[in-house]
Amino acid sequence: MDITDRILQNRIVSKVIFFVLRSVTLSLVSVTRFSLFLLSFATITVPKWAYKIVTYSLTIQFNFKSLLFLFFVSICVVILVVRYRYLNKYARLPHEAPIKEAKLGPDTNIRPSEPRIGFQNYLDEFLSAISIFGYLEKPVFVELARHIRTQRVAEGNTIYLGEQSSFILVVDGCFQVFTAPEKDSAEVVEEAGQPEYRLLTEVSNGAPLSSFFTVLELFTELIPEATSKENPFKSTTSSLRPGSSTTTEAGANNASKPHMPQPKKARIIAKAKIDTTIAVIPANAFHHLVHKFPNSSAQIVQVILTRFQRVTFSTGYEYLGLSDAIFSIEKNFNSLTAYELPNYIRSDIIDDFKKEAMSEHLSQASNESFIVLRSKGAQSRLSNQYFSKAFDKEHGNFVSDIDRSTANAGDLLSSTNPHSTLLSTSVGPLRKFPLNRSYSREVGDYDISASFRDGLLQCIFKSLGVFNYELKEDNDDLCTENDSSEGDSDSLKKVDFLGQIAMMSATDREEVKSSIVVSTKKSTILEFAKEIEIIFYKKGTTIVRQGDHADGLYYIIDGFLDATCPSKLTFSTSYDTDLGMHSFMIKPGGIVNYQACVSNYRSFINVTARSDVLVGFLPRSCLERIIDQEPLISLTIAKRLISLVPSLLLKLDFAVGWIHLNPDQVVYEKNDPSDCVYVVLNGRLRSIEDERGSARTQVDYFNEYGKGDSVGELEMLLNNRRSSTLFAIRDSELAKIPETLFNALSLSHPAVGLQLSKIIANRMNLLLNNKSMDGMQHQPHEKHSIRTLAIVPSSSTGLLILFSQKLTSVLSVMGKSVKVLRQSSVLEHLGKHAFSRMGRFKLSSYLSDLEDKYDILIYVADSGVGSAWLQTCIRQADCIYILAEADQNPNIGEYEQHLIAMKSTARKELVLLHPERFCPSGLTRLWLKERPWVYAHHHVQLRIGLDNEISQNNEAKVFLNIIRAKVQNLHYGFRKYIDWKHLHPVYQANRAQDSDFARLARRICGKAIALVLGGGGARGISQIGILYALEEAGIPFDIIGGTSIGAFNGGLYAWEADLVPMFGRAKKFCGRMANLWRFVLDVTYPQAAYTTGHEFNRGIWKTFGEIHIEDFWLPFYANTTNITHSRMDIHSSGYAWRYIRASMSLAGLVPPMLSDSGDMLLDGGYMDNLTVSHMQSLGASSIFAIDVGSEDSREPMHYGDTVSGVWALISRWIPFIPKTSFPSLAEIQSRLTYVTSVATGEKVKSMPGCFYMRPPVKDFPTLEFGSFEKIYNVGYNYGKEYVEKLKTSHKLDDILSPRDTSKRHPKFLSSRRNSL
């Protein structure tokens, strides 16, 4: 076997060797052959072919026709390549998705609060009810909770609220509140079981059954009645000699004063509709609260007074037309509480005051209607002159060295320790008010002007009801129960709140200690008397204007005033209707501005000087300091006020509900029952119509309601269900007026029904005026009255404070009172715990008061991300400005992320800050596509240098952050250096009204000035001339809108807001349009139009390039006619050339333009050639509309019932045949297409706030673009004449001369300390 195997192995090896050697041999042979082939090809074949080619000859022959044909073919190829490769770059622009509108609906997870049952959320119900008290410190809350008790009331039982001396809260169930009608009314309500009562309202879970008036009565119950049975100026000496004992009665006019009226007890009962559980806080709880916490009690009373005024008074006056009831309070106060100065003071001093006032007026030669009389030093000339006369006459030069201890004439009061203070440190019954002061016997120290001021202050306090008295003894007995609840007395049980409050942490207790601020400053009456200003008003001067916030009390020293209360129904559209005028005369000793100053609210009356008048002005700040020193004085003032309130307002107080809403909280939903009307007291609401059944919520329409607006009257009267969903945009306060209240008041006071009818009529008129917008897409209606504005940075920036300062200064120049709120200012006013859990109530009350005092509040979010102040800014804003530097990274910043997380539905607007007045193409879209929730955007030029950066102490760190951010975003800054378009001169605003901040301020104030340009072909050149004339007159524009050629001109102006580049670009475009050869070469087979549209497209694209509409410096829109959906579309984003071309697309001349979604768009003039209605919906108050459309003949025609085209053609050439007017086919089609536009254009001429202009260019044809200079001059001359007419009629005063607030009432003067 071994031998055989070896033999086999040897054979195999030999075969392998053989195959290997064979393969190698064959490979070598192949390589050799290929090498020989290459060598042969290179040395023989190639030279041979080269020789043949060089020596080969070819002859080609062409005739002239062939050469001409080849030439034209070559030309066509070149034209086609250039046409479709280089000249239509506009068709190859990158597709830009349309920017979607921001979602303005509420969070779908937020719904109206469901009724709560039983005691599951009893503490929440209690907290909700006592929220009418405002901010409560925790010890005060514990004191109230300690006395609360519950009671079960069976169905049908009644409680007499008019006689109830407890605070009642409905925990579970429902009460019906009834009132007794007037004696002269025979109408009854049978459902109450008591035929003499009418239903006012229904009160259900969580709502207080007691009214504001009841709460004030509980706090002031122990305050004794302020009577004037005795003369307050009795037993004073008749001479000025110190120590004299001879007495006389001064001020004889005050000898017999009427008693103050007792507080009205309204006949109001509450009937349990079902078995109901109530919570009761008895009267003694409030009495103990007054003794233990006088400062907090005064604060609660002030909050209740303000809300009583803001809810009850304001609703009754502005909405229900109860001006007579409101006016009676001021009238009764002056008729019952007038305290004149003593005769020995009024005799000579007043004459000297008048002489000094007249001499000062003549010396100043001023046109001012008031003069603030000021002392010339510590010892005034007037006082020394008066004292020296009286002293020399009576006593010669004798002066006693003994300090005076008896009453002297001129002191008005008995002596007291000069170092006595107004407030001691003890807390208990009200101490006697130390209105007394003593003077030195030396003549140099005796200042009768100080005694005069003391007398004024005393008269003011006596008018307010502040006399020398002490509190009554507190009655600790519980208030008696009414008959209907006697059987349920066993169910009265105590509620344990202490367990809830014991859970408060040590930190919360520390917050309580720090939140109770007790003033330690002890001031004498002299220090407060120095605050009084002596002001002389000339006859006819308006001292108090209706709607102004109270800044102090006016005491009439001499002269007469007229107080008037115009009955006005003010609508949100600034439509006022005068319904009458109430008036009375205020005599010396009377008080002006009482109601507004006591409640710290705005005035309801106008007060003018009937004659030259001398008044003493006590600032509101001084009164507040006095109340801080002696808190219980506020209870006395409140008791005097509630004694003057008529019974009608008391009934209104029980029926009108006060509601506080959080952001995004829904008031009612669509299809809910309509049983009440809501009036916005503070905040902002939005109503929307949506489709809940669909997969996504489709917002079809919305409207916004600000302060003073009402919602729901039409549905309530028609007994229809709610047609929309209403929700709160931010923290809001509403007054709820039930339908039952309207029914009750309409029977006894028919004026209420008339008032409501006027509201409905005005609302229907607005709906009819808005019908012109039904054919377009549903667009949001901007509300004009922005009361609160939040400025939030996109990321950390040092321009936040500078931006807010510039905006505030412009708003102030426009006549608006503005308050800027920063975190530091709020903390300084409210303390370090202002943003704590309990401090939010105090913060909310503080912000509400500021909103009542100022026209606009600006919240500057200058805190860190996620801070409580940032959340407050967002929650309180009607509109949010997101501040960003345009040359930075457009990604969403950290502040914006926090804003998105809060899901705020307030309108958010992006403000892009540019160092130059220029925006590169496409830059704005980079910012907007990342922020679909942005509603609008603004371009603002804000230059900042190193001086501005380091102007504040804390700017060093900010400056470093700016440097770091600029380095990180450096590649964005290179855009302006490499873009050739930036090399053109940049426009600079030279006038104040042309600045970007003035434009923002006008938008905020609802005074935006808009420009609407109509279509008309070449006649639109005249619009440029009119614009030049308007700009010469100083008229700025904030929003631009246009149709057809108006869209072209408007786009050019909105691009850079400068007429110089606009003029050049427009003239260049008209030159292209005047070249008819361009359109001849563009003619094609008339499938969709007679031309391809290329030359038209290229002419517009050569003008605008790749710029987007959102890159325009001014807001701009163009309208088109969407023939796919038969509607009018508004375009405010996308490529400018594309939508301007769509707005200029005449049917038949150029094909329709396609939108991004494939819709066919034609000239917007077919639907509305002058879009004034849409411009009004954007918030413009003044609109300049320029109409250059063709005027069709309105002459009647008489061509018969049939028309022969042949006879019409022949009749033109036969002279002896009577000429008959025949319409052409083109004219008929043109009139047909413009039917809708003509109808809307006629309405424009009569719209309020619209300045309609129609230059005389009807003789120029539509395509007469070659007459540029001629048409331009016609427009310019017409514009000059129109502006002169407006100036002559003073219609441009508000636009050209914004109201300046530098000359205002003397209560705003800074130097008050030197007034006499």
From Swiss-Prot:
Membrane topology designation: Multi-pass membrane protein
Biased composition, class Polar residues, residue ranges: 233-256
Motif stretch (GXSXG): 1042-1046
The EC number(s) this enzyme carries: 3.1.1.5
Bilayer-crossing regions: 24-44, 62-82
Name of the top EC class for this enzyme: hydrolase
GO CC aspect terms: cytoplasm; endoplasmic reticulum; endoplasmic reticulum membrane
Keyword field contains Mitochondrion: no
Cytoplasmic side: 1-23, 83-1316
Reactions accelerated catalytically: a 1-acyl-sn-glycero-3-phosphocholine + H2O = sn-glycerol 3-phosphocholine + a fatty acid + H(+)
Disordered: region residues: 229-262, 1296-1316
PANTHER family in the cross-refs: NEUROPATHY TARGET ESTERASE SWS (PTHR14226:SF29), NEUROPATHY TARGET ESTERASE/SWISS CHEESE D.MELANOGASTER (PTHR14226)
Family assignment from sequence similarity: Belongs to the NTE family.
Record-given protein name: Lysophospholipase NTE1
